[in-house]
Amino acid sequence: MATLLSERGAQASWRDYLELTKPKVVLLMLITSLVGMFLATRAGVPWTVLLFGNLGIALCAGGAAAVNHVVDRQIDSVMARTHKRPLAEGRVSPAAALTFAFVLGVSGLALLLTFTNALAAWLTLASLIGYAVIYTGFLKRATPQNIVIGGLAGAAPPLLGWVAVTGQVTAEPLLLVLIIFAWTPPHFWALAIHRKDEYAKVNVPMLPVTHGVHYTKVHILLYTAMLLAVSFMPFAIHMSGPLYLAAAVLLGARFLYWTIALYRDSRPHAAIKTFKFSIWYLFALFIALLVDHYLLLDF
């Protein structure tokens, strides 16, 4: 077996290492960090902060994702969604993946310290540790509230972007964090319902496994209602204008439609469709924040 893994590990390509970083997840995080940067100032964001700040955040996020691959490699090898990942198939060794993660993390922090500020770097480090160590290494296997508690680390990018520009933590970026924090449970619990049997098989205590599907659907509805309320707050505190409010209402109504469909079992494959729409919801909501911000500047 060791020989087989060694031979397969030698076949690792740059695509395998790119996959370790979970590029699609990192891309969504970068969009929210970019929005945080642009919302932080009425002037332009310095190009060095824009380029190297986001690169630093991306490298740290990719490093945390690589650690996640290492810790979850046995789980990944069993689940249909993840069984072809590089570590699950033995194309990359755990040692190589951890070395890769370390290089990414150190490089990202060095860029943040050099081109942004110390607070942005330390908050990014805290987020990295929160996801890679606290969530992946402990919470994921310890409690059905893993997503709720660990979601704070994943919600940090808009705060990181804001702080990279201003060097300060204020109410506005914390509100952006709150939006992602409220979005995280319905996003992941919808996937957990869709993959319930697989999570049960690998003994990961996701909410549908420990408390049942109906209980999870109720909580998805509750968190979606909270998300909708929180998503209106940027308009309420004059952080955004009517264009954003309209987008928040329309996107929120569609998100609520899918969570109600999931609760009622009124649409086929409602769980995975809710999960997929939630990704577009967050992307579109933050783009609306950005567009609205520059429209406000024009008027």
UniProtKB/Swiss-Prot annotation:
Keywords: Cell inner membrane, Cell membrane, Heme biosynthesis, Membrane, Transferase, Transmembrane, Transmembrane helix
GO terms for biological process, alphabetical: heme O biosynthetic process
Family annotation (InterPro entries): Protohaem_IX_farnesylTrfase, UbiA_prenyltransferase, UbiA_prenylTrfase_CS, UbiA_sf
Catalytic activity: heme b + (2E,6E)-farnesyl diphosphate + H2O = Fe(II)-heme o + diphosphate
Membrane association type: Multi-pass membrane protein
Similarity annotation: Belongs to the UbiA prenyltransferase family. Protoheme IX farnesyltransferase subfamily.
Role played: Converts heme B (protoheme IX) to heme O by substitution of the vinyl group on carbon 2 of heme B porphyrin ring with a hydroxyethyl farnesyl side group.
Protein name: Protoheme IX farnesyltransferase
Lineage of origin: Bacteria, Pseudomonadati, Pseudomonadota, Gammaproteobacteria, Pseudomonadales
